[in-house]
A protein has these predicted regions:
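Positively charged, solvent-exposed patches that mediate nucleic-acid binding
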Residues: 1-134
Length: 134
């Protein structure tokens, strides 16, 4: 049995300005699970990087203080890191393997517990995995 990797490497973070622009340019799929929204886009095999690249965004409009924005980003990254196997397993089992770019956007103006964020993250990842298999 293969042991799961619970890490979030630099390669898994979406840093490319071109990819970020393509992700938010429109026509890509989006799904909310309050307090999160995910925007995702399939990438071709020719694109470099990890199987799934993520971006976490917490608007300054929602949290004025950087300390709180950083706390929320940390919670979202941690929830993804602990549950990314849901999406990775679905991508590996699909007949035409591809890469994906994901952006997690925080929608609420208040903090939530780590457990609640993780529950919503699972909901989002299962939704993307189901849609990917179809």
């Amino acid at each position: 049995m293969e042991e799961k990797q619970y890490t979030l490497s630099k390669a898994e973070r979406l840093c490319s300005k071109k990819l970020i622009e393509r992700l938010f340019a429109g026509g890509n799929k989006s799904f909310p699970a309050f307090p999160l929204r995910v925007v995702y886009m399939p990438l071709g095999i020719e694109d470099e990087g990890a199987e799934v690249s993520i971006l976490v965004s917490v608007p300054k409009k929602r949290f004025k203080r950087a300390v709180k924005r950083n706390l929320v980003k940390r919670q979202v990254r941690e929830a993804y890191r602990r549950n990314k196997y849901i999406l990775l397993d679905a991508l590996r089992q699909s007949e035409n393997p591809k890469r994906m770019a994901l952006a997690f956007i925080w929608l609420d103006s208040r903090l939530h517990s780590g457990d609640e964020v993780e529950h919503k993250m699972k909901k989002l990842l299962y939704h993307i995995a189901e849609e990917k298999l179809q």
